[in-house]
A protein has these predicted regions:
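Extended amphipathic ligand-handling, pore-lining, and cofactor/metal-binding catalytic surfaces
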Residues: 1-174
C-alpha cells in the first residue's frame, strides 16, 4: 500500500494498529500525534461492514478520542467489499492457487460468521458478502453454482448466519 501511494506521489505513512493485539490502536494513535500527523484515515481490514467488526474498530478510535486533547482530521473506510482492486486481488489469489494445486469442482468462499440478529437489525454484512462472492465468481468466469458461499467461526448458542462451513464441506464431499 505504501509503495503504491508513494508511486502515485502521495506522502503518507502506513501504520498497523490492532484492537486485540500489538501494536494497540491507542498506542499507534498516540505515536501519530507525537509525530504531528494531522490527518488519519482509518482502514479496518474488514472488507464487508458489520457492527461486530468494522464498527468495533471505529469504537476503539472513539474511545481513544475521549482521552486525547489533540483532534486529528479523521476519515473512515466503512467497507470495500465491491472495490474492483479488492475483487482483482481475490481473483488473483484464487488463480494462483488453481495454478499450484489445480482447479476443483467447486470454489468454497467461507466468510467469518456473525450472529443472525445483527443482520435482522439492519447490518449489511450478509448482503455485502454475497455481493463480494458474486463479483468474484463473475471475475473468474465461474458458471452459476460453482462458487459456494458458507460462514464459519460460530460461537455460543445464538443463531448465526448460515450455511455453516463444516456441514457445507461435508455435503460437497459426499
Amino acid at each position: 500500500l505504501l509503495g503504491s501511494l508513494g508511486e502515485a506521489g502521495h506522502r503518507v505513512q502506513v501504520h498497523v494498529a490492532m484492537r486485540y493485539g500489538s501494536p494497540a490502536l491507542p498506542d499507534v494513535m498516540d505515536e501519530l500525534m507525537r509525530q504531528g500527523v494531522q490527518r488519519v484515515l482509518v482502514l479496518p481490514l474488514y472488507p464487508q461492514y458489520s457492527a461486530t467488526t468494522t464498527a468495533s474498530a471505529f469504537d476503539a478510535v472513539a474511545q481513544w478520542l475521549q482521552r486525547t486533547r489533540r483532534l486529528p482530521e479523521l476519515r473512515f473506510v466503512n467497507d470495500y467489499h465491491d472495490d474492483p482492486a479488492y475483487i482483482d486481488a481475490l481473483a488473483s489469489s484464487v488463480r494462483a492457487h488453481w495454478q499450484r494445486e489445480g482447479r476443483g469442482e467447486r470454489l468454497v468462499m467461507s466468510f467469518h460468521g456473525i450472529p443472525a440478529r445483527c443482520v435482522e437489525r439492519g447490518d449489511p454484512y450478509r448482503d455485502q458478502c454475497l455481493r463480494t462472492a458474486g463479483l468474484l465468481a463473475n471475475r473468474l468466469g465461474l458458471p452459476q453454482g460453482e462458487l459456494v458461499v458458507s460462514l464459519q467461526s460460530r460461537l455460543g448458542r445464538a443463531r448465526w448466519l448460515e450455511p455453516y462451513t463444516e456441514p457445507t464441506l461435508r455435503q460437497l464431499a459426499a
